[in-house]
């Protein structure tokens, strides 16, 4: 999986 900043990624808490 690629590590890119996204509104969805922040939702997971990164």
Curated annotation (Swiss-Prot):
Its EC number is 2.5.1.18. One of its GO terms (molecular function) is glutathione transferase activity. GO terms for cellular component: cytoplasm. It is found in: Cytoplasm. It is an enzyme of class 2 (transferase). It catalyses: RX + glutathione = an S-substituted glutathione + a halide anion + H(+). Keywords: Cytoplasm, Transferase. Belongs to the GST superfamily. Monomer and homodimer. Conjugation of reduced glutathione to a wide number of exogenous and endogenous hydrophobic electrophiles. This is Glutathione S-transferase. The lineage of its organism: Bacteria, Pseudomonadati, Pseudomonadota, Gammaproteobacteria, Pseudomonadales.
């Amino acid at each position: 999986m690629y590590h890119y900043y996204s509104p969805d990624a922040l939702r997971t808490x990164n």
